[in-house]
Amino acid sequence: MSPLRLPVRTIAAFVLLAASTAALAAGPATRDVAAEEANRQLVLTFYDRFFNKHEAVEAAAVVADDYKQHNPHVPDGKKPFVSYFVGAFQKNPESCARIVRSAADGDLVYLHVHATEHPGDRGEAVVDIFRVQDGRIVEHWDVIQPVPEKSANANTMF
C-alpha cells in the first residue's frame, strides 16, 4: 500500500480548521454584563448632561483628569476637553446630540449619535467610543460624517 500524499494546501487547510475548532470549543471569554451595563449607563448620563444640557463642568466629574482624546481637534486632559466644548456650546447654544443606539463590550461603550447645531440642521452622524476604567471615562475615539442632502439609497444614516 502506498503512503497517502496530500497537497500542502490541503494539509494547511486541515491545520487551520483544527485550530479554529479548538478556539471555538474554548468559548467566549467570561463577560461581566453588570459592569458593562454600569459603564453604558455612566456614558449615557454623561453624554446627555454634557452634550444636550450643556452641563459641561458638572458632567465632566466622571471624566479622568488624564483623559486621552483621539479626536484630532480636541486636546487631551479633562480641563482642555471641557474648555473646548464650553466654547463650542457658547457658539452653538442649541446644539444637541440624540443617541440613536448604544452598546457596551468590556470597558468600551459605543454610541451612534445624530448631532445637530440647531433645529433644521441635517447634522452629523457620529460614532463615539469611550473607554471606562474604575467608574471614570478615560479615553475617547470618534468618527464623524455629515448627513448629506441626497443619498444614493433610501436608507437613513440612523
Residue positions per predicted region:
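N-terminal signal peptide c-region/cleavage motif recognized by signal peptidases
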Residues: S20-T21
